[in-house]
A protein has these predicted regions:
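DNA major-groove recognition helix of helix-turn-helix/homeodomain DNA-binding modules
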Residues: 76-96
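Helix-turn-helix/homeodomain-like alpha-helical modules used for DNA recognition
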Residues: 102-103
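Short alpha-helical DNA-recognition segment
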Residues: 46-71
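The alpha-helix within a helix-turn-helix
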Residues: 41, 52, 87
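A short, Lys/Arg-rich alpha-helix, primarily the initiator
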Residues: 10-45
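Generic structural marker for isolated residues within well-ordered, non-membrane alpha-helices
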Residues: 37, 48, 83
Length: 103
């Protein structure tokens, strides 16, 4: 049976395609955030582990943020509270981490 692309039975395929398209749009933003975090961390003389601990997140999660990838093929999408905790630990404004980014 062939299900037309707009049919409700084919909604999963449509969502997957849309999600992939959104991921592609978010890659540059996730990578830019990762670079900004890395630069700010290095400027403060902190290790990834020390910054993660100060922000209350795992080192593994922080490493994923710097890389910009949550799992293979998926851009990182941190919570606002995580961004605030990292900005606080780095003694920078959240805007310095995310300001000026666009798709």
């Amino acid at each position: 049976m062939v299900v037309p692309s707009g049919h409700p039975l084919n909604a999963g395929a449509v969502r997957a395609s849309s999600s992939t398209s959104q991921d592609e749009q978010w890659w540059p933003i996730a990578r830019q955030l990762g670079l900004r975090l890395q630069r700010a961390r290095i400027d403060k003389g902190l290790s990834q582990e020390a910054l993660a601990h100060a922000a209350g997140i795992s080192t593994y999660t922080y490493q994923k943020l710097e890389k910009g990838e949550s799992r293979p093929g998926t851009p990182m999408n941190p919570r606002l509270r995580t961004l605030i905790a990292l900005a606080t630990a780095l003694d920078v404004r959240v805007e310095e981490l995310v300001g000026g980014m666009s798709e």
